[in-house]
Amino acid sequence: MIDDDGYRPNVGIVICNRQGQVMWARRFGQHSWQFPQGGINPGESAEQAMYRELFEEVGLSRKDVRILASTRNWLRYKLPKRLVRWDTKPVCIGQKQKWFLLQLVSGDAEIHMPTSSTPEFDGWRWVSYWYPVRQVVSFKRDVYRRVMKEFASVVMSLQENTPKPQNTSAYRRKRG
């Protein structure tokens, strides 16, 4: 489903842990990394598409995450000309995306790259919050910067409310 301007409706997903790190996924068989994302099917809401893509791409279900925020507006990026499929009609020149910020509430063990015939990702890792903005492919960089800027205060408040681990190796005075 391509809109009149040539953009495909899509959802993007930022998954964070309690430490404020974000899940960074490696595209199958490539050296490029990105956040999970995928198209919105006809008749599907952005939230429904997000949960479907979440399960299809990283094996997480609704019970594994909590929605913390979503972008106020649709964000767009254009594909480089070399990636546009000119032989398809209508021609898709880019993506318009609604982004969701999710907190992982289950454990890391629940994350698994599905073994379908066409998996999207073949690996993942936790990275610092701003790392993806510098590392994503250049044509997505502006959207990533805007998404991370919009979600930053939510993630930072999450970190502030997370209890810090006790320093169990602290020096103790002997009473004598």
Swiss-Prot record:
InterPro entries: Nudix_hydrolase (IPR020476), NUDIX_hydrolase-like_dom_sf (IPR015797), NUDIX_hydrolase_CS (IPR020084), NUDIX_hydrolase_dom (IPR000086), RppH (IPR022927). Residues 6-149 form the Nudix hydrolase domain. The keyword Hydrolase applies. One of its GO terms (cellular component) is cytoplasm. A motif (Nudix box) lies at residues 38-59. Belongs to the Nudix hydrolase family. RppH subfamily. This is RNA pyrophosphohydrolase. It comes from Shigella boydii serotype 4 (strain Sb227). The lineage of its organism: Bacteria, Pseudomonadati, Pseudomonadota, Gammaproteobacteria, Enterobacterales. The gene is rppH.
